[in-house]
Structure formats: structure tokens, C-alpha cells
């Protein structure tokens, strides 16, 4: 900045001059901090306005200097340039005016042609008109008709005025856009055309005889096209529209076609004035026929000038039009890739949701569309997919199906770009679903991308509801602002953990969160498939109690009373409520909760109440001797979805026989008979209001001394006391606090290692620890923070101390310090480094003492070059363990749900082939649960986290589903809310007979709500080949193994049962295949040194013996040899007990008349014991005087009844 120092003159000062303190030496070198900010004005609204002048005082002893900025823009040329070119609005007006002038000149030319009559004579202006008709008969071409036309004076005056304006405007624009090279401006096509159409008219002003001279004014159509292009560009720039390439190209193509046709029509018509004098319409007809390549030949030019023009026009069309079409096709293909735009008008008049994904796969797309459009009220919604990658072939093929092409719009773009969010009209969307890419190798990076997308959408459209899927639990707190968040690893590990204590919890939850009508498998000849498919249609619904026909009549009654009678009368299962003044959902709040009309009821049923029809029928009242009717509901109306509601039995019992039962008694024990010995067993009534003196069994937080004494008596040694509290160290931010069983003091890290002794203990294998309960082994690649959620549900406070299973983490990589810090407070939690493809690792971690082995999907194998190959290693390893340890319950997580058909694969099993056909049939029928009949899924042995994607989609309609699922999984604990558990039906419990009577028994005795049954049936899987008798007969167990088995069963408390032969004929029929299988299995273990010096005779005998043995014996021998090599006792390896000839499935909310069967496992929602402690002021002794249930705290939590 140049600075000057002038003497201070009072006469020069004025009120508009701003003074500042004198500048120092340092200020002269740089910009003074006192410089005022530059004021910017709108170019559109303040055209030509200049910033005001600023004055700076350089020194107090000198005069002030006024400095004016942007003086270069104050010149006359700059002001004109600003008005004609730079300013968007004014330049748009100028171009619109210019475009109108060009169209007007073309219109005037048409008027001149229509008024022109060559037969009246032609010639110069004010000259005598001469008729050249006779002369022209001797010559073929009348050139005078080409050079001279008849132009009326008013028409000439208007054309001259327009030409003069156009000429002046062109000269002005040439002057303003001059950049040093005048020839570049002169030789432009637009300038040459402008001169041809304007200069001759200006000349006629000064030379009147030339006023009838022909001037090709019709060429102004090309100038109008050029002006229109510029005008559209200015318009898009003014309205900030950037995605206009396709529109511009289509407009250019249409204008080019129109200009070619108009130029050809006018040119041919004028040249034919010297021939047969074609009319303007006939010339237009000829051009259309010619350009459409039809060429009828009824109208043709007769003279060579017009013929030459036709040739020229065709050549121009052959050059120009292909270029235009090529550009249009290219833009069309690009638009097909990018998806175009979702118009603002559609966004304001239609409802749409936006799906943001990093990469769109066909499975994810179909899961979303099937689940989203399964709800009737969402049929009119549109789905806008915003994805940064190009649409793959499979997705493109699906989106071309009419069912989806009318409702799904694919946009290629990024959620981090506001212009792409604008294209998707995110601010008008009903919801935005942001899904993470779970198949990425770096799942943390995938979460980071999801977080940025969520932030970008929240910043752009703060009022749009957000539904976010996150992978890692430690990243969840970054998106807490979202309306609904599903953390994949939290749900996955909690579900896998509950699968170990409540079998097939993963199947139960998956069926609940999938929308189905219960029509799957109804045409199957198998009874279990029809019943399983029918019950799979049950979902969770909600209704306000005051508006409900199901629950309205139970206002003022207890929750337990309402649940039982609603199930008895309508077949619906009431599982929870939400108070109007409280936003928390309570699962089974217990009999203390009194139902109010404002409560929101959550229930399980085939369909919601609003879609149900009620058929009321008057039934005969049952009259039984000695039965009081207080607990019986006389209204027999029910939903038509249940064919028969069985008799609920008696509801009265003698209260004098309800004293406290012994500790080892079952809560479903047969009531003592009174009076006549042939009297039917009775069940206690479900009370309308809770009796505070006889509510529930003793709470779990009381009588710890008794619990400890019982444990001490069993072990005969000192027992480490457990305390109940909240884990002191959470591995990540945002984990829900859960009351758990904890160690009084944290275990040292060295004690957490299972296979290595330390100074605190010398145990090096699971056998040495002498655990009372079976192990739960978890195989994972790394000890991620999500694994913490596997431990917490298994150590929750409501689980009895007797039922706590030791947990062994089999990790590929060593866990980090912070993870060990988080788990060291939990009892009986250990880890070990190893993999499931190493037999030694499996044996050292105690697999033969385990009931459940959980195989977690590895992050490093989630992506594969070939689709669906990510699970190959896991499937093969699990199949190996299935062969080696047939009695083990293996729960496997897969990346792709379609691969579950390979679990426990039997190539020659005709029954599995029949199930495969059933799955294909259900998929063709459009079922969302086509995979449900696969035996591993039905039994809860396989799970894929992608099955829970529908949980997020369902939350759009059912905003409570995520909360209920987290409560069922034990991820969240709400005071007063119950928890999911299971109980097993034994022979002593079969007197109850039906599920409806079981519902009454549980509601009346312990206020538990059953929601389903896990049923296991024996089934013979027929093979396609005859059985090998040798394989079935050559099974022997030596005396030593029997003694070892007996010893381990006495020590581990295992109940012996009937064993089945699990050998299959197809495996034993081919010894070569068995030998290959043996070699493959041996590669899993570390072999010792081979012994030498054995004789050939001994080798031949061993080979003959190996040939005669079955595969089962070979694998058993392999396992025992490795155990001996590792120094492990071979006791406990039961080679006979397996589950290969059984099938299991889940029945959600079965009808009340469903018969109970032996070994059924009933899913229960048990009320929160802490709620009763908080609400009841009675002592533990008064709680133990329960008249309707057992008094021992352990009895209430036993799963074995």
C-alpha cells in the first residue's frame, strides 16, 4: 500500500473522513490491525455501487489521505461490462431481449414471404416493376427472383430498426469483450452472421433502391439458438443450479434440429422462386421428409441452386447431428450412472426416505426393500438411494423390475456433498438410513465414514430423522444425536451370549424383527414346518390401552392378570408397557403394576389389533365340581388366527397347601392332592390385584449367606465370594451400566490366562480348575470392545450364582491391556491364545468340558474376491469340529446368511435336499424368511448379523423395536423391567399338558410371562444310499474309557442318558474318503516325532484295523491321542452322545392348546427382582413366606426345573 504524508489542513477535512491513530514503524511493514473489514455488496442488487472511501491518518502531524478502493471498476467500460456481462440478473435480461429480437426477425421474414408475390413484378425500390415471366420461359433459372423481393415499407422500417439495435449491441459487446486480438472477435461465426443480417439493412437507409434486395434474415435462427444457450447458462447460474448438463444438451440438440429444418425450408423456398415457386409449407414438408430419410419424391427442388442447398444441408446435418447425439448419449449414460435428480416438486408432494450406503450389494438392497415395503402404510413412499459407487449389474437388473423401478431412485453421490444431498432432497425426506459397510477389512474406518455421513446429514437437514447403523461400540457415542442407532457388535455378542443360556435366542429375535404373515411352510407336509412357519409370523405391536379391545377391560387390574387373560381370550402375548408420563419401556413389570388407560401396551401377535376381526360367540360355561369361578374368564371370544383355544383347566386350589417348598423343588411341581385321589390337578388363579404378602419368590439380592453356604457345602472348600455391583471399568464410552456378579477384588492379569499357571495358581487346563458348570468357549480373532457385551449378559445380577458358566475366550491375537482391565472384575472369565483350526488349542481350552462353542466371524475374512466366499474357512473349520465333537453345541456367526446351508452339511441327506427345495419355493413366493427352514438356523446354531438389519428398518414404523430388543438381550437395564430367561420342561412338569395352562401356572405362581417354546424332536435323516452294517456294528468302548467317563460324570455332575449311534453309511462305505478325512483332521494338530523301527507286519495289521474301523472311531482315536500327547486326561470325551439325529425349532407365542413335550424349553420374561425389593418394605423373611411359589432364591432362577 502506498502511503503519503501531507500537511494537515483544516479546510480539507470533512465529516466523511475516518481518522485512525498514527501508525507505528511496525505497522508500516505489514497490514495494520486497525484496517476496517472490506464491505461486500450483492452484485445483483447493487449494480455499479462502489465501496465508500476510507481515510487513514499516517501521522498526527500530517494531513489525512483519502484512499479509494477498486477504482479500476469505476471506469465507464467496467460499468458497462458489469451490466452486460458480469451481473447475473442484468446479463440475463439482456440475453433474453436479444433472443426475443432474433425470434422477431425470423417471424418478420415469414411474414415477408407470405406477403411476397413474384408474379406481380420484381425490381429495385421505387423502380418500375417488370414481369420476367415471358423472359424466364426461355431461360431455366430466373435469377432476378433470387436477388429481388417485394418488401413493404412498414415491414422494411421494422426490420431496419431491429437490425440497427442488433448491430449496435454487437459492436458494444465486441468492445467490452476485447482482449487484445480483434481478429478473434471478427472471425467468429456469430459475428459474421450478425453482420450479414444487419449491415445490408443499414445500407438501405442511405441507398433506397436496395430496399428490395434479398437478405437471408432467416439465418438469425442460429443467432437465436446461440442467445438461448447463453440465456440458459445465465439462468442456471442465477438460480444456483449446477446439475444442468443433460438439460442443456437436450436443448441444444432440439434447437439444432429446428434451425436446420427452418434454414432448409426458407432457403429452398427462396431459391425455388426462380423455378416452380414452392410455397413455404411445401418446402417445410420436403425438409421433414428428407431429414427423416423417407424421401417420397412428390415434392422436389427443380433447379440446381436449391438442389445444391439440399446437398449442403444434408452434409451439415450428417456432421452436426451425430456429434450432438454422441454428446447426448454420453451424458445420458453418465446420468444413468449418477442417477440424475429427485425433483423438488416431487419431494414436496410425495414422501420419500433416503438410504445412504458406501457400497450397495443386492442382498442389502433386497433386505431393505422387502422389509420397508412390507408395511401397508409405506406403499406410497419412495426410496432414494445415495451411494458414491456406480450401480453394479445385479442392482441395476433389480431396479429395472417394474415393482421397484417406480419406487426406487438411485443417485450416485456422496452424503458429504451438499449438492448431492440437495439432489436427494434430504431436507424434505421422511427419514435417512445410514448403513455401514460391514464387509470392509478396516471396520473402524467404515465407522468413521458412517459418522461423517451422519454429521453431514444432520448439518444439512437437522429436522430429518436419522437411523444409523454403527459397527464398533466405541464409535456409538459419536452418533448419539441420531434418532435410532443400532450397534452391530453390541447386538451380535449379546445375542450369541444368550444363545448359550437360552437356546436359539438369535432365531427368536430374528423372527420377531422380520415382517411376515405367517404363511411360510403352510403347504409343507411336515407338521413342524407348518407350525414353525405359522408362529414365525408373530411380531411385536403396540396400542394405547384405552383404545384397545384386547386390553381395555383390564384397566385397574394387575399386569400379570391382563397378560394371562388376554392370552387366554385373544391369543395375544402382552410383554410390556410404557407409562404415559415415562418414556421407558418396562418388560413384564410384574403384578404390582396396575394397568391404566393411558398406558401403551406392547404385545406379540400375528398382526396388530387394528387389522384384526373379532368374532364373538356365546359359549357354554363350564361347571366343575368344587371349582370357584373367580379366576376364570367367561368371555370366550378370540381371534380367528387360533383355531381352537383349549380348556384352561381348573383355576382354584386349596390355599392351605401353598407353604414354602424345599429348595430343590420345582416351581411347576404337581400340587398336593386334597380329598379324592382322582381329582384333576389344579392351578392357582391369577389375581386381579397383587397380594403383597404372597407375591414372588425371595429376591436375588437377599440370603447371600445361604447361597454361599450351599456352594461351600457342595465344594467342601473355601469359596470366593461374589458381590453384586456395576463393573468398574468399561472398555468404551457409552456402554449401558448393568448390575453384575463381580469379584470382590480384581483378578491379576496373570490369573486370566487359562493355559498358563502363575504364582497365584498352577492350573494349566480346564480340568484342573474343577468347574461345576460346563464351559462356554468363544472363538474370536481379536478381543474387541464388543466382546465385553458377551460377558455382561452372562454375569448379570439376575442369574443365579449356581448357573454361572465359566467363559473361555479363545483369541487369535493377544488381548490388549485395556480389555483385560475391563474383564478382570468378572468371575470365571479366562482367555487363551489359539485358533479353532488347531486341535491342540481346542483341547487345551477345555472343549470336551464345554456345552457351547461360539465361533465369531473374523474381521480379516469378511471380504473376499468372490462373492459369498468370505465364510469358507469358518464353515470348513466348524464342520471339522462338528465331526470331532458331535455332542458339542456350536454356534457360528457367518458373514452371508445364504451360506448357512453349508453348516453341518450332509451331501447325501435327502431331507436337507427337500428343505433346500422348500427354501427356493418360499423365496419365489416373496418371503422375507426363506432361510428359516434351514435346520441350523431353526435350531439357533447359526447366525448372521445382516439378519438384524431389519431391526433398523422396522424402527421407522415401530420406534420401540430397538429398545425392546436391547432389553431382551440384556444390553440395557431399566429399573422395573424384566429380562429374558428360559426353563426346561421335565417329566415332572408334563402334568400341565398345554401351553395355555403353563401360562396360567407361571402367571399365578411367579408372575413370569412365557413368550415361546424351543422344541427339539428326534428325526431320522434318510440318506440316498443303503446303510453299511459294518459301520453300525463296529463300535466298541473299552473298560478304561468307561471308567474314565464314569469318573468325569461324577465329578462334573453330568446326567447319563440314552446314546445313539451317529455313524452314517456314506462315510464308512469308502475307506479312501475316510483316510483323506483323517489326514485333513490330523493337519489341525501338531504332530509329534514319528517313531521308527516298526515292523512291516505291525504296519499291515494297523492298516487292516484302520480299514475296518468307522470314521467315528478314527476321529475319537485322533482326539484321544492328541490329549495324551498334551498331557491332558482323556476323561470326558463322550464319543457316543451327539445331536445329529434331532431337529430343533422355535415357536413364538404358540396357541394356548399347544401340547407341551418333554425337553421343551420355554422362553420367559421374568420380572425384575430389584423392583420388588425397591417397592416392598417387607423383610426377606416375610418374602420367604410366599404362598404361591417357592421361597428359595435359587429355585426361581433354575433353568432345570
From Swiss-Prot:
SUPFAM superfamilies, A to Z: Voltage-gated potassium channels (SSF81324)
Binding site for Na(+) 2: 753, 756, 771
Protein's membrane topology: Multi-pass membrane protein
Binding site for K(+) 2: 770, 779, 810, 812, 834, 857
Segment forming the signal sequence: none
One GO process term, biological-process aspect: protein homotetramerization
The RCK N-terminal domain, residue ranges: 350-486, 773-913
Intramembrane region(s): 280-300
Positions of glycan attachment: 131, 136
Free-text description of this protein's post-translational modifications in UniProt: Phosphorylated by protein kinase C. Phosphorylation of the C-terminal domain increases channel activity.
Keyword set, alphabetical order: Calcium, Cell membrane, Glycoprotein, Ion channel, Ion transport, Membrane, Metal-binding, Potassium, Potassium channel, Potassium transport, Sodium, Transmembrane, Transmembrane helix, Transport, Zinc
Binding residue positions for Zn(2+): 750-751, 758, 760
An MF annotation (GO) of this entry: intracellular sodium-activated potassium channel activity
Topology, Cytoplasmic side: 1-92, 176-184, 230-249, 327-1201
Protein's name in the database: Potassium channel subfamily T member 1
Gene it is expressed from: KCNT1
